[in-house]
Each structure stands twice: as C-alpha cells, then as structure tokens.
C-alpha cells in the first residue's frame, strides 16, 4: 500500500498528515505544504481540490521543499496514488485537435519532442498502455501533466493551458 506524508514546513517540520489513498480535498489536514516524504509508490499531487490545477508527479523519496518537486508554491490540495501498471507503454500523439494531422506512436521516453518529431505542439493524444507524464519543457522540466490510458481530444482534456509539450516520459515502477 502506498504512503505519502505532507508537512506544513520545510525540512519535514511542523504539522504533518499521512495519506495512503486518493484524497479529493486535503485542506482539512493542513493549510500549506512545504515538504513531502513519499514512502512508497507514485503519487500525483494537484494544486487545487478535486484533482485540478497544476500537477506534480512524485516517486519514492524525500522532498525537503516545494522546489524539489518543481512546485510553483506551497499549495497542494488533492492527491492520487498511481496503481501499479504492467510493462507495456504505448501512446499516439497528434499535431491537430481530435486526432487530426500527423500521428506519431511512442513507446519510450522522449527528452525533446521537437528534436524527435520536429514540432512542439501536441493537440491530442491516445494513451493505449501505461501511465505517462507530459512536461512543458524539454529534458523533463516545467509543468507536468499526468496521462492515464484514454483519449484526450484537446490539450485542455489533460489540464494543459497550451498545446506545447517539450518532453514526455513513462511512469515506471
């Protein structure tokens, strides 16, 4: 079973809350989050309640301040534990909305979408197998978007504010 511990202050200080399952609203348990310990599994953290806002994908480890998980601020209001996946990863990305335009199939990590495919924008995608993370910038930097199996007809379906995707990687156990 997964476990994550949220701390109000940096360096694992202050009031804390232990969580072992999805939680749509963390605000009753702490007012701010400045450090986190992930004791097991992968977790997706959200800036707002009900799995909305900026997303941060964390694996087992210690994060003594929010910059360590690429956070923009100390606001974490909901979280999801990622279930274990198989060893198969497959996704189709499209240069236009609703699966239009050029299609590329991906089965491995991509540190630079532009270097590999010669375009920066992904307007829609189909995740067939595995869990993935889209990053706003190359080399796995910037805003993160958690991608589970399913169809995403436009970038707003995965929570994106624009169609720009700089890199993407598989979530591997």
Swiss-Prot record:
Q: Name one GO molecular function term.
A: structural constituent of eye lens
Q: Enumerate the spans annotated as Beta/gamma crystallin 'Greek key' domain.
A: 2-40, 41-83, 89-129, 130-172
Could you tell me which InterPro entries the record lists for this protein? Beta/Gamma-Crystallin, Beta/gamma_crystallin, G_crystallin-like
UniProt-listed Pfam families: Crystall (PF00030)
**The entry's keywords:** Eye lens protein, Repeat
The protein's matches in SUPFAM superfamilies, at most eight in alphabetical order, are given as:
gamma-Crystallin-like
Which residue ranges does the record annotate as region Connecting peptide? 84-88
Record GO biological process = lens development in camera-type eye; visual perception
The family note in this entry says: Belongs to the beta/gamma-crystallin family.
The record's PANTHER family line, in alphabetical order, gives: BETA/GAMMA CRYSTALLIN, CRYSTALLIN, GAMMA M6-RELATED
Instruction: Say what the protein does.
Output: Crystallins are the dominant structural components of the vertebrate eye lens.
Q: Regarding domains, what does the record say? A: Has a two-domain beta-structure, folded into four very similar Greek key motifs.
Question: Which named protein is this?
Answer: Gamma-crystallin S-1
The gene name reads: GS-1
């Amino acid at each position: 079973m997964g476990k994550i511990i949220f701390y109000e202050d940096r360096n694992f200080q202050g009031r804390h809350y232990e969580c072992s399952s999805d939680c749509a609203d963390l605000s009753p348990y702490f007012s701010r989050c400045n450090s986190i310990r992930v004791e097991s599994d992968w977790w997706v953290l959200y800036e707002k309640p009900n799995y909305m806002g900026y997303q941060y994908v964390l694996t087992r480890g210690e994060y003594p301040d929010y910059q360590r998980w690429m956070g923009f601020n100390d606001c974490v209001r909901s979280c999801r534990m990622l279930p274990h996946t198989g060893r198969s990863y497959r996704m189709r990305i499209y240069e236009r909305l609703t699966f239009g335009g050029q299609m590329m199939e991906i089965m491995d990590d991509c540190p630079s979408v532009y270097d590999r495919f010669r375009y920066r924008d992904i307007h829609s995608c189909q995740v067939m197998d595995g869990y993935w993370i889209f990053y706003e910038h190359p080399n796995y930097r910037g805003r993160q978007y958690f991608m589970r199996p399913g169809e995403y007809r436009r970038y707003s379906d995965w929570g994106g504010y624009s169609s720009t995707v700089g890199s993407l990687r598989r979530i591997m156990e």
